[in-house]
């Protein structure tokens, strides 16, 4: 996946629009991911499980040495014009949502299933709220 994506990025900056679009469609079909070629991804970033289910906004910026789990969404929020900026050495767990004009600081860890709508300072850890059992009376 990483090699295919690097080739895809090279096509973005060339006159081979048909090939770039073909690769984009194949990434979507095979890996069910939506990673536009406009996304700025730093060096040595890794996507778990070949970026399965990952959705990124075209204007997202991801720093160096980040690790992103499967089914992660990083994008905007309704009514907001800016999108998330992810720092260096950030770990984002599976099924995490990072939405709106937020900045994730260097070295931060976003736990699996977390929903981030506020800035995360370096090197904070964000975890989702624990599950609760709700018993309804019959």
Regions found by a protein language model. Name each.
Residues 1-33, 131-132, 138:
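Terminal amphipathic alpha-helical/low-complexity segments used for targeting or macromolecular assembly
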Residues 11-12, 55, 79:
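Alpha-helix initiation/capping motif
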Residues 12-13, 52, 94:
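Residues at structural and domain junctions
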Residues 37, 42-43, 48-49, 57-58, ...:
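Left-handed beta-helix
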Residues 74, 133-134:
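Short clusters of hydrophobic/aromatic residues that line enzyme substrate/ligand-binding pockets
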Residues 125, 134-135:
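Conserved protein kinase catalytic core
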């Amino acid at each position: 996946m990483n090699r295919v994506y690097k080739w895809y990025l090279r096509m973005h900056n060339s006159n081979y629009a048909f090939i770039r679009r073909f690769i984009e469609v194949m990434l979507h079909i095979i890996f069910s991911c939506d990673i536009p070629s406009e996304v700025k991804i730093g060096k040595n970033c890794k996507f778990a499980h070949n970026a399965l289910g990952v959705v990124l906004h075209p204007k997202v910026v991801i720093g160096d040495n980040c690790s992103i789990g499967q089914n992660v969404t990083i994008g905007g929020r309704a009514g907001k014009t800016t999108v998330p900026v992810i720092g260096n050495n950030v770990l984002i767990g599976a099924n995490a949502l990072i939405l709106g004009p937020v900045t994730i600081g260097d070295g931060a860890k976003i736990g699996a299933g977390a929903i981030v709508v506020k800035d995360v300072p370096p090197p904070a850890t964000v975890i989702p709220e624990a599950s609760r059992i709700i018993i309804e009376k019959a």
